[in-house]
Amino acid sequence: MKLDIKGSMPKKIDVMELFARDGIQAIDTYLPVETKVWFINEFIACGYKHVEVTNFSHPRFLVQSKDAEEVLAGLKRVEGIHYKTYGMTPAAAKRAVAAREKGHPVDSMALTISAADLHGMRNSGRTRDEYKPEIKEMFNIFKGSGLKLDMAIACVYGSPCDGPVPVENTVDLIKWGLDNGLRDFTPCDTTGESNPVRSYEYMARLVDEFGK
């Protein structure tokens, strides 16, 4: 397939820095609060405008998440920076709202729903349909708080458990999210298997369905 993209590329892109959440969550040795805060501030000083700063998941699953509120308390809001957090449950959503009410820099929280059910079961113990009621509850918790809920969609190209994943799975999840008030979605190439052609075809399908 030959792609003619001359003149259609965006003039700029936004890059989100994920070190303080995704980058260290698999490290078993706990990193102290001051280390995380230092890295976050350094990334902001480098010019990143979107930074994912912490995880509200239970520390029995991820040792790095046991200090979420302390990390947020250690940060001073910088104008023009979007501070993003992560959480998978209504309890996490309540913690994010509480942190924002205390004046800590929290602008949004992401959750992850998998486009492939077997991966979803192994990653979070839920199928897509089983997780949807919790997502609705999280959205309702955020109402009036000023926080945005970002639905990250895992395995949009393929799953290590399920194999190839059709783009229709993404389309169906975004449609459901829109119908239930969500406006922020992040498709994720969890397996790192995409290429320029597949990415173009995938995004073209989403643009055809939802517009730019």
Regions found by a protein language model. Name each.
Residues K49-G74, L111-R126, Y157-C161, T186-V197:
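Glycine-rich, proline-tolerant flexible connector loops at the mouths of alpha/beta enzymes
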